[in-house]
Structure formats: C-alpha cells, structure tokens
C-alpha cells in the first residue's frame, strides 16, 4: 500500500513540474500520458483496498465460524461426559428384589412379568414394542422428555438374552440384575449392571454406550466385551473381545483396553490391564465353563450360579486345584461326575444341599 502511494505521489509531482515548465515543452501527448498513469495508479490502489477488505471480511468470518464450530462441538460432547447419575440413583434406590426361581421383568409403572423359559429372549424395539419369546407383551408409549427404566432380574440357574432398543445385544448370566431404559435418547446410552453380562454393542459414533456398576463404568462406541460385577464377590472384571473400551472408577482413574485384555477391579481400584485367553471368561455365553488351575471353591461358586444349587465344601476340598471344561447344558449329576475325574472328591445329597467331601482320608 505504501509503495502504491509513493508511485501516485511521484506521478503527481511530475505533473506539477510539467505545468511549471515552459509551455514550449508541453504537448497534449505528454499531458495525456501523465494523466493516464495517475488514473492507472488510482485504479490499482482502489482494487488493492477492495481485495484487502474482502480478505479481512473472509478471514474474520472464517475465524468466527471455527470458534462457533468448536463451541457447538464442545457442547455436543459435553452432553456425553457430564456425569449423569440418574440411572445409578434409580438402581441403587430400588428395594432389593431377587428372583427365586423365575426370570422377572419389571417394567415402568410397577408392571411385573414372569418370564418362564430358562433361556428367554427379550427384545425392545425403537417404536416401543417389547417381545418376550416371540410374544408381544407390551406396547410402550415413547415419550421424548421422560426416561423410564426397566429391570431384568435373573435368578440362579437361569440365563437370558436381551436386545435393547438401539440393537445392542446382551447375554445375561445367572444371579444378575440389569437396569435399562425402554428406549435411549439422542445423547446417551446407559445401563446399570449387578452381576455378569456379555455385550455386543451396536456401533454409534455419535452416542457412546456406557455400562455402569457400583464401583466403575465402561464406555464404548461399538464393541464386544464381558462385564462381571457381582456384589457378593470381592472382585469385578472387564474382558474385551473386540474394539476398545475405556473403564473409569469413582475416583476418575481411567484404563483403556485392547482386544484380548482384562482388567480386574478390587474395591473400586483398577488394576493394570493384562493379556489373557478370553475364552474362559466368555464361554458361559455358550453354556460352557472352562477352568485352569482353579480352586474348587471358585468352581463350585460358579456352579451354584448356573444350577441354583447350594454346595457345602469340606475345608480340605476348597483349595484343591482343578482344570477342565464343563458343558452346562448337561444335568448337574453328570457335571459333578466329570469334576470327580479331576479331583479326589465325592458327593452327598442332604436336605436339598450337596456336600462335597474329600476322598483322601477315607
């Protein structure tokens, strides 16, 4: 800009000098040439000023658009990460209810439905339809502003499959309670779990899926993983099959898992992730139980869940280590017979309880 001003000044000075010079040296051609040069410089200066104004307006608009985009994006993601304890408060404030022999589905409005089948299949649709074992049992009114929760309570000896309204599939193990909404809103997908579930989460990059428990939560976009969080046990765990998950405890400490990794949670504290063979942790979905160098008391705790039978173990039996694989579709008598090939034990039935005794001192 300064250069253009200097050029115009230079030409103007020459024009003034020309007027002061002798008329003999003045010709119309010279005058026209000087005037054209002045007009040319003025046009250049005007064009430059116009270009600068356009560039300024464009730059200012771009910066404003970027900041607006950042603000809106921040607002969008803040809706995910602002702590919302609605479902946790609901789950923890419910009167403890256990299912003695049948699977119980508690729907909004205190409606209780007994699901008789051992391996029931419950499906929620986006339009509000609920189907249990191919039978439509309820047509829910979808309300945009009101979040209503369901509870699925599985007794010992039973398992079920649950499909949520977004298409996420859950395999729910024995002795488990799951709290979930009839449908998910646009900003949040959350469920609450006590017990054990295996999940195949429907992928939605705009809406993370969060599994909450008493001591920790797991956040994903779409993946396959197992959560074990029985209140009666001192340890919980998360095992990742596919994708990635982020686990966060109540102290906000976070751990990220890669496929084939497990994290244990003791009293709410996250251990370091470790690589494991995932099959023993997830084979219950296929009605199998795998164990390698496991104490017998842990094996029988799992059998207590799967079959709903109470086992009383001789102290000498509790810490015996066994390895093997059990088909949980078989009768309990056959399963116990299989275990007896791995350890020196025998069984006695008394008062609807099974006593597991040692053969060593007989």
Regions found by a protein language model. Give the residues of each.
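Alpha-helix initiation and N-capping motif
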Residues: 9-12, 31, 35, 278
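Short, charge-enriched, intrinsically disordered boundary segments that mark the beginning
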Residues: 1-26, 360
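Intrinsic-disorder-associated interaction segments
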Residues: 5-8, 24-27, 31, 47, ...
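Gram-positive cell-envelope targeting signals
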Residues: 12-19, 35, 66, 75
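A residue-level detector for the "anchor" residue at the start of short, highly conserved motifs
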Residues: 46, 50-60, 69-360
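N-terminal cationic amphipathic segment used for targeting or macromolecule association
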Residues: 10, 62-63
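Positively biased amphipathic helices and basic secretion/translocation or surface-docking motifs
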Residues: 21-56
